[in-house]
Amino acid sequence: MKDIFQLVSDYQPAGDQPEAIERLTEGLAAGEMYQTLLGVTGSGKTFTIANMIQQVQRPTIVLAPNKTLAAQLYSEMREFFPRNAVGYFVSYYDYYQPEAYVPASDTYIGKDASVNDHIEQMRLSATKAFLERPDAIVVASVSAIYGLGDKDSYLNMVLHLMVGDTVDHRGILRRLAELQYQRNDRELYRGTYRVRGEIIDIYPAESEQEAIRVELFDDEIESLSYFDPLTGEILHRVSRLTIYPKTHYVTPREVLLQAVDEIKIELAERLEQLYGANKLVEAQRLEQRTRFDIEMILELGYCTGIENYSRFLSRRQPGEAPPTLFDYLPKNALLVIDESHVTVPQLGAMYRGDRARKETLVEYGFRLPSALDNRPLKFEEWEQLAPQTIFVSATPGPYEQQHSGAVIEQVVRPTGLVDPAVEVRPAGSQVDDLLSEIRQRTAADERVLVTVLTKRMAEDLTQYLEQHEVRVRYLHSDIDTVERVEIIRDLRLGKFDVLVGINLLREGLDIPEVSLVAILDADKEGFLRSERSLIQTIGRAARNLHGRAILYGDKVTGSMGRAIAETERRRKKQLAFNETHRIIPRGIQKAVREIIDGVYTPGSGKGHRSPDRVEEKAAEYTRLPPQQLAKRLQQLERQMHKHAQNLEFEQAARLRDEIKRIKGWVFNGADSASAPRQENSQARAIC
């Protein structure tokens, strides 16, 4: 039988990778429910997981702690599995202000959100991959445990078409309306359809570049094909196809009517409780808001905040778990949790924060009690749904340690690089000593990361270093994701030499140019100076041939001692492996390419833009706020469709390529249409 998962890479597993792949595969075959891959920074954990997926040939969901790391993993998995269905499932909100009420000031804050159309399309494509293909890999954030449309209702609404079937022309249009597709005979874009005689063109909501053409002859389907919505070129013909709803939250009409009846019953019960407690204002508010929602549902099929009635729409019992992405997983799926020491606690925290906010809304008459069931999964519910699981972390947390049947170490790097040497120095002269170390590193054209305890300290230290003519920037939580990526990229390019930060300098920073990590006030016990945090931070220097970590403190705390001991244990094992196998460590020469894609290789061919110009263009778009960026993309898409209508296909194609490039810069999902990607080194391919 031919393998359905086909890993594409020029490199073979090395270091500890072959043993890790073998042990993980054997553990899955033996039925181990939980395993942990304890892989140090730069050891190629993603490449190990990719090889394991190819070995076991099972669909996989990969959970990441945030959108940034999810985008990096998505990009890497697409490179490893170009012939398979690799999906991306994160929150589709560019901006989200949840509904809330502050009793102290009697302030009601309505829900406000901006939906990213591109990510919504990728979410739909991800669930479709799980439903249709056995070779699906989906990278998701903790958004995967939030309520999604009921899987059974979603599947019951799909429209199946087959060549030769007898159909009613009006019946197809009626079914498309039920799937929430809109008719638009002037321009065709995602989620719309147009009718020209006996030809029906449909642009599926989950499709990025292909539309569907249904050709009828009287009441019979004569032809089904996929075509380019810009040029009209037929791409390929098929004998059958399936059209999925425009949204995960589509609901049959009969279910809506049944839900309305149940909402009315709960409203009557809740009003009786409020009047009995003499809460007249709350009762009046609740009745007015709920009856308005009911009218909207009956007339339009939806209302603002319809998710608060999701328990009725998905026909669940009070307290029953909501449908989520995990309900869409195939029975033989695998779960990989990246940076599990961060992701697992997040999974437990989502429910508690959501519950506290909604209880206030219910208490003061803004929502019915059933709104409490519009929630993420509880941790126990997630545990019941989770398939065989592999935790991936350099510093596994207590949950992983307690539950894992096997802990597989991946300490030896394919490049032969070893963990940095760790040194403890007095805190009294830490700033002056740091300045001296920075001078040495910058003279060698190397970069420095410095971690402090507070935002104020980060800003003050940055100002002090600037006064001493050090090229320095700081990084903390007030800086948004896109600007954060730009700062890291500028550090790698050498636009500055020192980056000062707090907690943001731990997981997910891949900067081979950093040769020194300095941890100020390392002897201050706490979350930021715990054993796990220190090991993660020290690991930021592990990708450099001259990597070194300095911990400034007047005493060696328990956390410091354990972190230093663990780093030294790994370092000894790596050095012994290198000596036994006569490996000479080599530095990583990694192309400067991260979540903001689209920087072209110099001299990559005639007609390509210069690197500087492209960098400026990429920076221009990535600096835009999400709402402005979405608006700009919509403007370009409208212009593209207008050119296509006027048969100006060259201009339309140019705009299509421009849109693709922009999405590549921002979402790291699309390749640049006019420039090849840079070739990565061996270390980049396997790390």
Curated annotation (Swiss-Prot):
Q: What Gene3D superfamilies does the database record attribute to this sequence?
A: P-loop containing nucleotide triphosphate hydrolases (3.40.50.300), UVR domain (4.10.860.10)
Gene Ontology CC terms: cytoplasm; excinuclease repair complex
The Helicase ATP-binding domain sits at 26-414
Answer whether the UniProt record assigns the keyword ATP-binding to this protein: yes
Protein residues bound to ATP: G39, V40, T41, G42, S43, G44, K45, T46
Report if keyword DNA repair is assigned: yes
Q: Where in the cell is it found?
A: Cytoplasm
Q: Where is this motif: Beta-hairpin?
A: 92-115
Grouped into one coarse class, the protein's main location is cytoplasm
Q: Where is the Helicase C-terminal domain?
A: 430-596
What domain notes does the record hold? The beta-hairpin motif is involved in DNA binding.
The record's family statement is: Belongs to the UvrB family.
What is its quaternary makeup? Forms a heterotetramer with UvrA during the search for lesions. Interacts with UvrC in an incision complex.
State the HAMAP family in the record: UvrB
Name of protein = UvrABC system protein B
The scientific name of the source species is Nitrosococcus oceani (strain ATCC 19707 / BCRC 17464 / JCM 30415 / NCIMB 11848 / C-107)
